[in-house]
Amino acid sequence: VHPVEADIRKWSHDFLEVPNDKLNGLPPCPYARKAWVDNQVKFSINTGLEGLTEEVKNFETHNYDIVVWASEELPDIEYLDGICDGMNEALSIAGIDMHLMVFHPDFDASDAGLDFLEEDGITSSQLEYCMVFIQRLSILDDAALSLEKSGYYKHFPEDTYNALVLDRRRLRDGNG
């Protein structure tokens, strides 16, 4: 197992899957554990932006719920975010049920106003990498709709909620 994959698995187990009072007692990612148990996570590590493009192109050819593209070579956050935003817009216009979500060490939970989601000390300080999660947009939005009803987003700043939930919903509805 690649060290980055091991680190992501640890982050998921020790943080994403752990209940949080500020999320109405739910874990940051209530669906992560099931994806691991069902072997629904595929990794693409250090394949460059070409590898990310390939994973997007080939997403419909497999049955994984999520592809985690990770890179220890860090593209500029604005550049990576712009690529993924552009892909998300194009996928929405084309009616393709897919969404890319960026995680970058230059923009953490506190930058998004989500201090309660800080995970200091959980991941390796020896590794630095960015990630893009590739998933089905409909499944993400259906999950968000369910989580909204549970009070999950109650402590999210409005601009973060808009970016994470409402902007994604607009893409799903074809109103990018």
What residues fall within each predicted segment?
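Expand to "…catalyze enediolate/carbanion chemistry for C-C bond making/breaking, isomerization
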Residues: 1-176
